[in-house]
Every structure is written in C-alpha cells, then in structure tokens.
C-alpha cells in the first residue's frame, strides 16, 4: 500500500509540473506534435522547448538519418560503413561532444526513449575537461531512486556503449544480466570492479546493437577493449569519482529496477497527458506508437468500436504490462505451442502463457483491452504473431529488426562473450582459469 501510494504521489507531482508547463512548451515550440507538446515542457523538470532548435534533419520512420556513413569508433568497437539504427538514433539525440566522441545527457537519454524523433535541436556542445567536471558535479548528491535521470537533467554524460546498455536493461529480463554478472565475478562475492563492469557493458551492448542491424547493411569489427578516458554518469554512479568502489549485484539490480520504473512513469505521464490514470485509448496510442504494420488501421478501428469511452488503466496495471514486455522471448515460446497445434489463442490461454513467462498475472482489464485491439477477425482470439511484432517494435522504440535468433541463442552469445571477458580479467590478474 505504501509503495502504491508513493507511486501515485510521484505521478501526481510530475503531472502537476507537466500541466503547468504545457502553456510554456506550446508557446516555445512550433508544431511539436501532440505527444511532444504534452511532455516537452515540464515532465522532464524544466526541459523547455528552447532546448530544441535546428541541427539534425531526420525522416520520421524510414530511418533516413542525416548521419554520415563512415568509419566510426566508439570505446573499442569499430563500425565500418553505415551506422546501425541505434547508432543513428544516438547521434540524433546526443548533444555533447569531447575529442570526437559524442555523449548524451540524462535528459537526452529520456527524450530518445520517449520520442520518435527530435524535430529541433541545439548545436552539439563541445566539452573541455573543466566542462566535464562541471557536468558530472551533481551525480554524487543525486538521489539513487526512480527519479535519478530526471533529477540530473543535463548534468551527466552517457556514452554510446552505455546508451545501448541502458536500452537493453529496458528490454531484457534481469536473469540474463545476473548470469553475465556472475561470469565476470572472479571472486564469487557478487561484486565486480570497474574494468569488469566495462566488459559486462560491452558484452550486453554489443549483442543488442548487432540485433538492430541487417547483415547486408553494415560490417562490424571489434577492436581491443579499452577503458574510456573520461568519467561518465554510470561510472561515477557505480564506482565513485576515482573508480575505486566495487559494484554489488544487489545495487545493480536496484538500479535496473529504478530505471525501468522511471521510464514507465515517464511514458505513463506522456500518454496520459499528465493525469494519474490512462484512458484505454491512450494505452492503445502508447502500444501502437512505433507500429507501421498494414493492419494498423484495423487496430485503430477496433479501438474506436470495441473500447468503451471512460474506461481507464492504472499506473500499476501499466507497470505490470511493461514488466511482461521484458519477457517477450519466453512468451513467444509459449505462443509457439498454439501455432504448432494450429489452435487459436483465447483469453484464458493468453493469461496462462503470461503467467508462465513472467511469473506474474496481468489484470483482466489489461487483457481485455489487448484482446479487443488485436482481434483482427472478430472471433475473440488474439493474432499473437503480429501482436509480438508490435510489442517488440514498441520496446525497441521502432528500431527492432526481425531476427531468427531465439532468446537461448542471444544469451548463448552473451555467455560466449562473458567467457572471453573472464579470460581477460584472469589474465590481467596473473591467474589461471583452473
């Protein structure tokens, strides 16, 4: 009860800021789009539209970014040819640069997760060493809860590798991170040092980035892993200013949970227009925001004809659904049983599959909404394959490229890279594996 009350209080507080900032944001930004106008002013604690001016010209959904196709080096990974979709998106939203490397602020990261594109943006700011120290000065005093990125605002640096790492936290279950964490924990105390964390970050980030690239588009080579020459937000958050602290898995798990909660609360506020509840139409808009399937018009027809006006979804229901979306691979395996048996997926079967995949249940309110939206034939059955595609696009913010890689193959790659990382750690420590 206390936790729920706290969440409601946070939503109410941010909702108040959002509503007070709407007038300011609408005056400052010319034609920002219905969702950008709703949040750009106050939901990000003073993210005024003066922050937006021209720099990058971006096509909305076709991926034609004006990022030059060239050789790119980012903390040890060399990209040859056209950058990946995630790299393009990172360049679109990043606002800081130091010695040829681009960085996001915490506010940039939140915008990149919430919005499809940045319509107007200031010029990239070139940082000196003194600027970097000033930018990172607020991290030590910032709270470590579910408002961490909002509280920091522009006071922080996020590298491309860290950007990929944070996105993976939003789209994958915690279990895989725990496995990779333990693989790099050579002492068995569930604590890792800074250099080991870099390897964990590289392992996860590399796999996620490769999954957003079509094999005939981009060539990748991996250079020797090297530590960044400057501190970043995550480094100082986990290891302190001098990098001498150790990171315990429990602390890292709390960070993952808080990050997921923060993004969920931000997106809830964005699509509920700052209210403490989300209309079912708003939920459908959130669900279909990054979708370009040929059946999108049918989905919206279902929303208009099948969802009753005045019905809403609570923040807790929304969070439960977001938790479910981090287990899509496991859920897809459960759905394959119905495909192989040529059986339609009805509400009871869907509810059971969710419980098996996540260990939790979705409310009947959410399930009823999902079924009404994705019932293409009017037979009260779910078109689950396209439903999964819509959800994957939603969670990957429109950058998902369909793969033939299963979750087992994904974590097999992670395990392989983890073993390589372990060998390097032991080699540096002057120890043998056995």
UniProtKB/Swiss-Prot annotation:
Consequence recorded when altering residue 352 to A: Abolished interaction with MICU1
Species, as recorded: Homo sapiens (Human)
Any GO MF annotation of the entry: calcium ion sensor activity
Domain EF-hand stretches: 172-207, 227-262, 293-328, 362-397
A GO biological process held by the record: mitochondrial calcium ion homeostasis
Effect of residue 154 to R: Does not affect its ability to regulate the activity of MCU
Function noted in UniProt: Calcium sensor of the mitochondrial calcium uniporter (MCU) channel, which senses calcium level via its EF-hand domains. MICU1 and MICU2 form a disulfide-linked heterodimer that stimulates and inhibits MCU activity, depending on the concentration of calcium. At low calcium levels, MICU1 occludes the pore of the MCU channel, preventing mitochondrial calcium uptake.
Positions bearing Phosphoserine: 205
UniProt-annotated binding residues for Ca(2+) 2: 375, 377, 379, 381, 386
Amino-acid positions noted as binding Ca(2+) 1 in the UniProt annotation, renumbered to this chain: 185, 187, 189, 191, 193, 196
Family: Belongs to the MICU1 family. MICU2 subfamily.
Name of the protein in its database record: Calcium uptake protein 2, mitochondrial
Stated consequence of mutating residue 375 to A: Abolishes mitochondrial Ca(2+) uptake
InterPro entries: EF-hand-dom_pair (IPR011992), EF_hand_dom (IPR002048), MICU1/2/3 (IPR039800)
Subcellular location: Mitochondrion intermembrane space; Mitochondrion inner membrane
